[in-house]
Structure formats: C-alpha cells, structure tokens
Amino acid sequence: NYRIFAPEIPDQIDFAGEPAPLHLVTVREKLDRELLINTYWHTSTLTLMKRANRYFPMIESILREHNIPDDFKYLALVESRLENVISPRGATGFWQFLKETAREYGLEVNLEVDERYDPEKSTVAACEYLKKAFSEYQNWTLVAASYNGGNRRIGEAVEEQNTTDYYELWLNEETSRYIYRILAVKTIFQNPTRYGFYLTPSDLYPEIPSEEIRVEKDIPDLMAFADSLGIFRLILNKIKPL
C-alpha cells in the first residue's frame, strides 16, 4: 500500500549560522508547512535539485568571495528557481532585481543590455545589496527578509515592533513565509534521502560550457549570430535570453 508520511522536522536548524527557535510551536508549524509543500511537490523539488547542480558552484564561489554566508544560495533558489524569470512587477533574473535596484548595484539595464539576466553579474550585485543590508541590520535573517519584503518595510517593522527577531515580527504573508521556505529547501537539499529524494550524479544537470565573445557592433539578429558561430540557438538563448 502507498503511504504518505509527515516529513521529519529537524531538531535544530539555522539560517546563516543564526538558529531558528524550533522550540516555539508557531515556528515549528510554519517550517512544517513549507517542508510538506516541498517534500510532496515532487516535480518541483526534483527539478530544483537537478538545476542547482548547474548553478550552485558559481553562486557559492561568488558568495565566498564576498564573505556572504553560503545559505544565501537558497535565497536565489526560492526567488527564481534559478531561472531567468520576470515577475508581474518586472523583477528579473536569478536574483529578481527591479530595474532601479539593479542599476543602483552596478548592473547595466537599458534597451540593448540587461545584465539582470547574467547569473554571475547579478550574483555579484546581490552580494553588494546583502552586504549593505547587513551593515544596517547586523543580522543575516533580517537581511534575507529584507530581500523579499523590501529594506524600508523591514526597517519600519523592526522599529515599530521593537524587535530584531524575524521570528517575532508581524509581516505580510509572503515575507512571513520567506525564511521558512528557505529553511525547508535547505533541509531537504542537505538530507534528500530522508525526504524521499534519490538522485544519482547522472540525474543532475551539468554546467553549460561557455566562453566570452567580444563584439564591436550591435547584433540585430541573435539567432543569425548563433548560426554564424555554430552555436545551438536554444543554448545561446538560455545563456543570453531574448
């Protein structure tokens, strides 16, 4: 008989070295909710595991270079599923930058170039945001929450509610779930078989080999450009989305 089991809630867990207070019933239940969703939404979680193998090494390297905790790679996973998606508000790329914020943190965004689509450059820009936010909050959990809820809103919530503890703050639905979503994904990724996910190395998506090509003029037809270099069109579009 096919049986469905409740996913195991870990005895302890932390985000960026900052422990989550799992002894509190509300905290355990919120984490349980996200573990249930990610454990039994098999197609989604399996796809994320496969895709992370392609992009996590690059993200981890840049995070280390900028002294950002490794757990922030899961933030990118939750933000965009490591895809160059566009939100209804226009947030774009792995790290879901709005145009104004992207420019503020050094990304070129105009009619011809949009570096939000560049996984490496956008990761560097995200690190700059995270470092600036940490200089204000001195708390990585609040930094992650501010990435979702906005620096101003989190700052106002901290001041009005007189606490710097994310787990005590009253926030909107999305931001109040945000850290728990990250913790759930982290828990499953670190213990996949415990949650029923079995993957072999051959199941994982490999890195797409690439090289930098400098051009001296505009490229009016990217598909023709791909053909001229003998590059598979869909591969080029994945690296440089239209």
Enumerate the language-model features and the residues they cover.
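Catalytic cores of secreted or luminal carbohydrate-active enzymes
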Residues: T175-Y195, I231
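Primarily a LysM-type cell-wall glycan-binding module
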Residues: P201-G230
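Extracytoplasmic
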Residues: P10, N67-K73, L77, T92, ...
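An acidic, Gly/Ser/Thr/Pro-rich helix-cap/linker signature
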Residues: N1-N67
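Substrate-binding/active-site groove segments that recognize
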Residues: G90-L111, T123-A125, L130, I154-A157
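Catalytic and binding regions of secreted/periplasmic enzymes and modules that target cell-wall glycans
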Residues: L130-A157
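Solvent-exposed, acidic/flexible segments
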Residues: W41, T45-F56, E65-I68, S87-W95, ...
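Short, functionally critical alpha-helical segments immediately adjacent to catalytic or ligand/cofactor-binding
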Residues: I68-E83, V143-G149, L236-K240
